[in-house]
């Protein structure tokens, strides 16, 4: 996790929600302090420790946090994830942004852990894709790692992937790879997306570093993996669901990339319970929304 980027993101998210100030919290709490607990309301895998630690302290440096869970830990209903102490206005102002983020990231980590469990193949790495929420890619990919998965390229800038439209524009896989290599240099990996055995053989001849078997059934993936030289990495992707994932066990590919890890997840249920002068904030007044 890049903490400079994290702080930049959190500042943006807090400004979106708080704007020129939290009218409710500022008018009611003033300088009063409170205690808070972030609590799991459902089972899953936790992701977002840095968000809790960095988030509230950005709003007020006097906020103290004690984390009882680390990224990748199993959460059970009712377990305390973190304890917080500090100005009530800061904790209540930051509550919704922090909860929104850790709920979503924990949902992604939970889905990733389930995908790893369903595949049950230590030789194949479960990877994410670029099908992430705009503005949240760094965080969502961090959550995939917390769940036991691996990251595919972060963007169009850190890896070359030659797809059908690129091949059509160049006339062949060989020509597309040649142009990409000349432009990017030898330090950047080139991945080629293929669907047929003929395309596979052309990608091998073109010197691809990684070959993706796109929308291929398990038997085809197994066959293509056997045809691919050991020095070339292989990846299966496209149309793979949690239900179909076990059929890819033992196919011999190095990676399986799954869009649903980030685009179709359900957020984990996590709440923040606040007490003020031995009395629940909710008993004093309604402040959550």
Swiss-Prot record:
Supply the Pfam families for this chain: QRPTase_C, QRPTase_N
Q: Name one GO biological process term.
A: NAD biosynthetic process
- Catalytic class of the enzyme: transferase
Role of this protein: Involved in the catabolism of quinolinic acid (QA).
Q: Entry's PANTHER family?
A: NICOTINATE-NUCLEOTIDE PYROPHOSPHORYLASE [CARBOXYLATING]
Give the family, as the similarity comment puts it.
Belongs to the NadC/ModD family.
Q: What is the name attached to this protein's record?
A: Probable nicotinate-nucleotide pyrophosphorylase [carboxylating]
């Amino acid at each position: 996790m890049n903490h400079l980027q994290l702080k930049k993101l959190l500042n943006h998210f807090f400004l979106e929600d708080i704007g020129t100030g939290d009218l409710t919290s500022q008018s009611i709490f003033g300088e009063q302090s409170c205690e808070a607990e972030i609590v799991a309301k459902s089972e899953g895998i936790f992701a977002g420790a840095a968000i809790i630690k960095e988030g509230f302290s950005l709003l007020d440096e006097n906020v103290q946090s004690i984390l009882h869970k680390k990224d990748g830990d199993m959460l059970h209903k009712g377990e305390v994830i973190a304890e917080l102490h500090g100005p009530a206005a800061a904790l209540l102002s930051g509550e919704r942004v922090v909860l929104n983020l850790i709920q979503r990231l924990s949902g992604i980590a939970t889905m990733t852990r389930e995908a790893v469990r369903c595949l049950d193949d230590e030789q194949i790495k479960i990877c994410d894709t670029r099908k992430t929420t705009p503005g949240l890619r760094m965080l969502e990919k961090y959550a995939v790692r917390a769940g036991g998965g691996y990251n595919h390229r972060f963007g169009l800038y850190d890896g070359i992937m030659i797809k059908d439209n690129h091949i059509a524009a160049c006339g062949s896989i060989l020509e597309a790879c040649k142009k990409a290599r000349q432009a990017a240099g030898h330090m950047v990996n080139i991945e080629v997306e293929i669907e047929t055995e003929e395309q596979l053989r052309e990608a091998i001849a073109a010197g691809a570093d990684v070959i993706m078997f796109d929308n291929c059934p398990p038997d085809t993936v197994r066959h293509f993996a056997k045809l691919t030289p050991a020095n070339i990495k292989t990846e299966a992707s496209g149309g793979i669901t949690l239900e179909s994932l076990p059929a890819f066990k033992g196919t011999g590919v190095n990676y399986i990339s799954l869009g649903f890890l980030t685009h179709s997840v359900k957020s984990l249920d996590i709440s923040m319970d606040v007490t003020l002068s031995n009395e629940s904030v909710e008993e004093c007044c309604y402040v959550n929304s």
